[in-house]
Amino acid sequence: MPKTAMTDSTSKTSTNTASSDMAAEFDSTTARLNASLSKPQLNADGHLRHFLGIEGLSRAQLLAIIHKAESFFDDKGQLINSPELEGCTVMNLFFEPSTRTRTTFEVAEKRLGANVLNIDIARSSTQKGESLRDTLWNLQAMTADIFVVRHSASGAAHFMATEVTPDIAIINGGDGWHAHPTQAMLDMLTIHREAPRPFEELTVAIIGDIKHSRVARSDIAALKILGVKEIRVIAPRTLLPKGIERYGVKVFENIDEGVVDCDVLMGLRIQNERIGSPLMAASNEYFKKYGITPERVAKAKPDALVMHPGPMNRGVEIASSVADGPQSVILKQVNNGIAVRMAVLSMAMQGQREYQALRSST
């Protein structure tokens, strides 16, 4: 894995110093990471044993995650419990702040019957200079079955997958600018369940800070694999990654043109913690130029969905009347996140069991 994306001292390295070019992704570092993802993710049967990123997976594999997630809803649309991880231990390692992702993972793990440990990174030995590798090796000695990791460095989850013993599954809860695969899959599940048309007939617009967003990268990859008719990205040029046109998306700097006839409008927040300095003079200036307002929603299809991965800044990326309006599925995304994370955890654990059975027989 590229050492520019992850080294043994990554736990002490901030995103801003990891690589001066990382914010200009889709760059060569991202390409190298994506190219190497599929091998460690899958067992010999092509089933997940880690979940590190969307790239390298097939349409059938993404649909399998969606269908598995749907199996955790009853006939009334309520989530059910399923003891598929009973006896397993899951450790949640969040080196970055998180509300929705960490909490929904924990709920998912408990609904599956797992023993759940939330590691307090702020009080861990990484604060005393311990490397990520040494932290990892010490935690795996405590006989965990699954690590769920979020880290500020691109490639952290991949690094962990190559460093842990083969019987531990790694789930990527978001790594730097690189990827947020479970967010992408809960977005795909939401579109699958709520959109009035199949993926192949949809036009999806992603609006906001594309340049620094791991969500945008993973969503674009998933939408392309699932065969969406058209993907649009809408942002000021300063918030667009170099070379994004090569990924088959249509680029708009004018939101009023970009949202016309869209089936899905997906807002993103400005990632100020990754930028280091504000790119807009004031939030009201950004809202005026790029906010998702009722007037802009009206330019999309009449039954268009409004989505946002959160955290959501009302009056900056989106109007409150839109976020709380009839076309918003934002809270459904959160609930779907539990089902998707249940699916990924269950599938990765099953894939690990198959992998271990094969190793034992050879």
Curated annotation (Swiss-Prot):
Keywords, alphabetical: Pyrimidine biosynthesis, Transferase
Substrates-to-products reaction catalysed: carbamoyl phosphate + L-aspartate = N-carbamoyl-L-aspartate + phosphate + H(+)
E.C. numbers: 2.1.3.2
Compositional bias per record (Low complexity), positions renumbered to this chain: 7-20
First-tier enzyme category under EC: transferase
Positions of L-aspartate binding: 128, 214, 269
Residues annotated as binding carbamoyl phosphate: 100-101, 150, 180, 183, 310-311
GO BP, one annotated term: 'de novo' UMP biosynthetic process
Record-given protein name: Aspartate carbamoyltransferase catalytic subunit
Organism this protein belongs to: Psychrobacter sp. (strain PRwf-1)
Biological classification of the source: Bacteria, Pseudomonadati, Pseudomonadota, Gammaproteobacteria, Moraxellales
Gene that specifies this protein: pyrB
